[in-house]
Curated annotation (Swiss-Prot):
PANTHER family: H(+)-TRANSPORTING TWO-SECTOR ATPASE, V-TYPE PROTON ATPASE CATALYTIC SUBUNIT A. This is A-type ATP synthase subunit A. Gene3D superfamilies: 2.40.30.20, 2.40.50.100, Bovine Mitochondrial F1-atpase, Atp Synthase Beta Chain, Chain D, domain 3, P-loop containing nucleotide triphosphate hydrolases. Has multiple subunits with at least A(3), B(3), C, D, E, F, H, I and proteolipid K(x). It comes from Aeropyrum pernix (strain ATCC 700893 / DSM 11879 / JCM 9820 / NBRC 100138 / K1). It is an enzyme of class 7 (translocase).
Length: 597
């Protein structure tokens, strides 16, 4: 029986209700006459402390609070992809239509207490059953059938985790809605109806058979990421950076061009116009791997800065639960959260309302454990059930440290749980070097794990060239200290060449225009050819210096070719890589003529 209490205190997004004996932690409740969605976060005696995921303006003591008897959950099934939700999985386009029916002038507002089913009830999906027969044993994760959800993704309809028994009936091929029963399983003498959709509590990670080592790179098309600081499928990463360093554009690039089959984009507490930009741009883009519309693989969760702060936490958990669901089907999923700092600020505000003892910079003492809960749900796994399949959830979170201070609590705690750190540098951004990822501060723990893939699929010398280029960039930063003191005249010719090659790496390889149709995405093969061209020229130059040629003579010999080398990244498409080799050969020939001529 549902618990029913009444409001005794209201403090912003926090509501205290009495008469709630029998309520459970994290139970979903309806608050007030408008039935606002809330979640119980603390119980003391018969009083429940509820964080409300909608505006509490106009609530008053004495209004009812009704429990649902279930935790905050999401609906999982066909129809998720291509949809935009708010922080508690309400479909915003449908809400806009509902509001417009009452008053067209209020179409742009989310009315308080408005409800809409997350999955479309009126849409039919074509269900094709698996070759199962009556009496077969089935368990959680087993595939019952498949539905072509979009042009890119085939949705696997699975037995919900925790259900095990004998298959009594399976629907034949045909068109069904998400509420239709598509199978009946006999479990302990009782019949369990399985619909095309299932519900899952957002705070509980979905189970899996086995966790696998993340050995496959997640190709993003961003050269500095894929070559120098690679992300693995099932990995965790953070993009910290101050104001204006390009966090959002970097995350948009990842969402647009990544090799992931499904992308979950969470706009958590950031500006509304950034989500609007995603909505305007994504439908126009094609998936680089298939040529199909990008929205066919994307779920957007919009919880912008002008929406209730409590829902920021819900949006993070809703997003990761949807990601785990597609992982269980055997897909590689990328979850992008922009930004986890806004979620942490929401935790700080609610902790203050709860009168909890503040820790560092006012954040609650459990900030680290909440961040860990989120990032630990990433990973590459062997999914439950049959047929056997593996999937992954890759999590990348933006961090917005005030003033670009990486020692603040959210950034410092995040670094404990992630293995890739793409540090955005204000100086690089202000000098118009984008992406502004600082190669001295950034790191990736996946370089050794993904090396084998690069060697087998691209070139066996990838690691050799990559490490050599990294050494040049590190050496250049040391030499810059000397140059500031005594100028370039105090350097020997080899060190001068290191400075020139480092400049070539930065201009011709690291800089990348996210809005250029050719330069926005570089295949692994193009990345390697560009790097190889620059490094082969560097090696040849060092040989010539040994023979007495000066750095100035080398640069003069290259002449206009220097510009061709820098421009190759945005003048040569991914399918014409032989032109990069032609530029390289012409450059090496010009250098050879310095000695032979």
């Amino acid at each position: 029986m549902a618990v029913k209490g009444s409001i005794v205190r209201i403090s912003g997004p926090l509501v205290v209700a009495e008469g709630m004996s029998g309520a459970q932690m994290y139970e979903m409740v309806y608050v007030g006459e408008d039935r606002l969605i809330g979640e119980i976060t603390r119980i003391r005696g018969d009083r429940a402390f509820i964080q409300v995921y909608e505006s509490t303006s106009g609530l008053k003591p004495g209004e009812p609070v009704v429990g649902t008897g279930a935790p905050l959950s999401v609906e999982l099934g066909p129809g998720l992809l291509g949809t935009i939700y708010d922080g508690v999985q309400r479909p915003l386009p449908i809400i806009a239509e509902k509001v417009a029916e009452v008053d067209p002038r209020r179409r742009m507002f989310v009315e308080r207490g408005i409800q809409a089913p997350p999955l479309p009830r009126d849409r039919k999906f074509h269900f094709k059953p698996e070759p199962l027969k009556e009496g077969d044993k089935v368990e959680g994760g087993d595939a019952l059938g498949r539905v072509p959800e979009t042009s890119l993704i085939e949705h696997v309809v699975m037995v919900p985790p925790g259900i095990r028994g004998r298959l009594k009936w399976l629907a034949s091929e045909g068109d069904y809605s998400v509420e239709d029963t598509i199978a009946v399983v006999e479990r302990d003498g009782r019949d369990v109806e399985i619909r095309m959709h299932q519900r899952w509590p957002v705070r509980i990670p979905r189970p899996f058979k086995e966790k696998l080592e993340p050995q496959l790179p997640l190709i993003t098309g961003v050269r500095i990421i894929d070559t120098f600081f690679p992300m693995a499928k099932g990995g965790t990463g953070a993009v910290p950076g101050g104001f204006g360093t390009g966090k959002t554009v970097t995350l948009h690039s990842l969402a647009q061009w990544s090799e992931a089959r499904v992308v979950i984009y969470i706009g958590c507490g950031e500006r509304g116009n950034e989500m609007t930009e995603v909505l305007e741009r994504f439908p126009q883009y094609k998936d680089p791997w298939t040529g199909k519309p990008l929205m066919d693989r994307t779920v957007l969760i919009a919880n912008t800065s002008n929406m209730p702060v409590a829902a920021r936490e819900a949006s993070i958990y809703v997003g990761i639960t949807i990601a785990e669901y597609y992982r269980d089907m055997g897909y590689d999923v990328l979850l992008v959260a922009d930004s986890t700092s806004r979620w942490a600020e929401a935790l700080r505000e609610i902790a203050g309302r709860l009168e909890e003892m503040p820790a560092e910079e006012g954040y609650p003492s459990y900030l680290a454990s909440r961040l860990a809960e989120f990032y630990e749900r990433a990973g590459r796994v062997k999914a439950l059930g049959s047929p056997e399949r593996s999937g992954s959830v890759t999590v990348v979170g933006a961090v917005s440290p005030p003033g670009g201070d990486f020692s603040e609590p959210v950034t410092s705690h995040t670094t404990r749980f992630i293995r890739v750190f793409w540090a955005l540098d204000t100086k690089l951004a202000y000098s118009r070097h984008y992406p502004a990822i600082n190669w001295l501060m950034s790191y990736s723990a996946y370089v050794d794990l993904v090396t084998q893939w690069w060697h087998e699929n691209v070139d066996k010398r990838w690691r050799e060239y990559r490490d050599e280029a990294m050494d040049i960039l590190l050496r250049e930063s040391e030499l810059q200290e000397i140059v500031r003191l005594v100028g370039t005249e105090g350097l020997d010719e080899k060190d001068k060449m290191v400075l020139e090659t480092a400049r070539l790496i930065k201009d011709g390889f690291l800089k990348q225009n996210a809005f250029d149709p050719i330069d926005a995405f570089a295949t692994p093969q193009k990345q390697f050819r560009l790097l190889k061209m620059i490094m082969d020229i560097h090696r040849k130059s060092l040989e010539l210096i040994e023979k007495g040629v000066t750095t100035q003579q080398i640069l003069q010999a290259l002449g206009r070719l220097y510009i061709d080398i820098v421009k190759a990244k945005f003048t040569i498409p991914n399918d014409q890589l032989e032109k990069i080799d032609e530029i390289r050969d012409r450059a090496l020939k010009a250098l050879d003529e310095l000695v032979s001529g």
